[in-house]
Amino acid sequence: MKFFMVFVVTFCLAVCFVSQSLAIPADAANDAHFVDGVQALKEIEPELHGRYKRATCDLLSGTGINHSACAAHCLLRGNRGGYCNGKGVCVCRN
């Protein structure tokens, strides 16, 4: 059994080394599309992230812990607590 495991591990390592040694370098045609450094940062489009104020109250309202989750959220922000108003928005107290 030990011999079999040693053989399998050795075989896997050999396959990895052979696959790396057979890798073909990229040709110059692919280098034209590669963007590096500061230019790459300028060309990257920013991702759109939504900040949903109602996530704490609306998503957790079905579990019955909506006000507790809102209060915990406000405590983590450094406020004295909070509550969910009628529109489902977490309102933190000062």
From Swiss-Prot:
Biological process (GO), any one: innate immune response
CDD domains: DEFL_defensin-like
Keywords: Antibiotic, Antimicrobial, Cleavage on pair of basic residues, Defensin, Disulfide bond, Immunity, Innate immunity, Secreted, Signal
Stored InterPro entries: Defensin_insect, Defensin_invertebrate/fungal, Scorpion_toxin-like, Scorpion_toxin-like_sf
Subcellular location: Secreted
Family matches, as SUPFAM superfamilies: Scorpion toxin-like
Signal peptide per UniProt: 1-23
Similarity-based family: Belongs to the invertebrate defensin family. Type 1 subfamily.
Name of this protein: Phormicin
